[in-house]
């Protein structure tokens, strides 16, 4: 049985204005991960990802490079207990 996890992910660098959130949603849906992603006022992007550990980890790994126009300088991951509170993966504003 695969363990389910939650990860709070903060991505730093040139990650706003480059479709990072849109592509994160596409990747999340492809991986069957649920949660959200949003822009932060300081220029970072933050997400909450839930799902099978291998799928969440794959999305976190994708965040280390993001879409082609992004420049990722750092990814901070806080691993949390799975809550199962999301049915979809979407952009929050």
Curated annotation (Swiss-Prot):
Coiled-coil region(s) at which residues?
none
Is-annotated flag, keyword Transport? no
The entry's protein name is Acylphosphatase
Per its UniProt record, what InterPro entries does this chain match? Acylphosphatase, Acylphosphatase-like_dom, Acylphosphatase-like_dom_sf, Acylphosphatase_CS
User: What's the domain of life for this entry?
Assistant: Bacteria
E.C. number: 3.6.1.7
Which residues participate directly in catalysis? 21, 39
* GO terms for MF: acylphosphatase activity
């Amino acid at each position: 049985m695969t363990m389910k996890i939650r990860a709070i992910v903060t991505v730093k660098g040139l990650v706003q204005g480059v479709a990072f959130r849109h592509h994160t949603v596409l990747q999340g849906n492809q991986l069957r991960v649920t949660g959200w992603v949003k822009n932060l006022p300081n220029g970072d992007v933050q997400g909450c990802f839930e799902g099978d550990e291998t799928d969440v980890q794959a999305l976190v790994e994708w965040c280390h490079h993001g879409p082609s126009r992004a420049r990722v300088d750092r990814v901070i991951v806080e691993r949390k207990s799975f809550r199962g509170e999301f049915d979809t993966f979407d952009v929050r504003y």
